[in-house]
From Swiss-Prot:
The gene is ampC. This protein is a serine beta-lactamase with a substrate specificity for cephalosporins. Sulbactam is an effective progressive inhibitor but a poor competitive inhibitor. It catalyses: a beta-lactam + H2O = a substituted beta-amino acid. SUPFAM superfamilies: beta-lactamase/transpeptidase-like. It is an enzyme of class 3 (hydrolase). One of its GO terms (molecular function) is beta-lactamase activity. Residues 1-20 form the signal peptide. Changing V243L: In strain: GN346. Belongs to the class-C beta-lactamase family. Keywords: Antibiotic resistance, Hydrolase, Periplasm, Signal. This is Beta-lactamase. It is found in: Periplasm. Substrate binds at K335, T336, G337.
Amino acid sequence: MMKKSICCALLLTASFSTFAAAKTEQQIADIVNRTITPLMQEQAIPGMAVAIIYEGKPYYFTWGKADIANNHPVTQQTLFELGSVSKTFNGVLGGDRIARGEIKLSDPVTKYWPELTGKQWRGISLLHLATYTAGGLPLQIPGDVTDKAELLRFYQNWQPQWTPGAKRLYANSSIGLFGALAVKSSGMSYEEAMTRRVLQPLKLAHTWITVPQSEQKNYAWGYLEGKPVHVSPGQLDAEAYGVKSSVIDMARWVQANMDASHVQEKTLQQGIELAQSRYWRIGDMYQGLGWEMLNWPLKADSIINGSDSKVALAALPAVEVNPPAPAVKASWVHKTGSTGGFGSYVAFVPEKNLGIVMLANKSYPNPARVEAAWRILEKLQ
């Protein structure tokens, strides 16, 4: 009898730990505030907007100023520059193009840009561009490259440091070119394709590449060394770092990416899943199309340390996953993003139906963003 009682007690303990009581909105707010308020003070961030997706439902929180000079507060409608979180939109749009049969990741880059006649481009595929494994394309396209002719010259003159697929080196010039070439045969501009194929179907009505005049009042200023700034235009900027969005739209973006089964357009649904497929393994991290994934559960150190620029921007050996592994629900899926005056972070765990969006109008170190997100989600799981 004693043995049976102990077994029952153990089962009850396991049950309670597995099925913890659901958090109230106030409890969620307290957890978020206890992390974000000191973060803003430590990093001198003028304004932030955070969304929590908890049990599939979004909760929104805002702090501080979107425009210091005019004393405009951050609201749920405030537009923030996403920086490299824009790459996740690029990846999903590319996935939609693949699902439609309009491109293949195995296609050579030269199929879509025949003017690239340099021998170094032989053997480089769209997959290599999308996943930063072409052989060492640089982080940025030089600022003096200002038109299409100069862009072609830049890529023609580039010389790889490694064979395609040997190493991953994070680069706007890599995934940016993927985005541009992925839509080339559609007859649409990248912005038009993004709007029609991704933003409109997902009802992201406040997500922009070019912020229209009617939305300028909601466009936050970013702050760099205390001065207000907006991102400067550049070649392939839309594809690599050019999206602006609100916390409400970004929560909707996370919800769609966390569970694509509710997305009505089948090719977009497949595109979302393709963006979270695993194409390469780099240490503990798996590279998708825009998104980066780690197996869940995991230790905080692995994502916090991995987000540091010394690691994230380093050339690291890449191990091909062939065939690519489909999206894994037990994953920490995430992406950081920065422009001169903004810092963003998005992370979610599909298996837990749990996610976070952090938007700030100051760029601050990635590890601080990831650690804050981890602290919050750890208390909510």
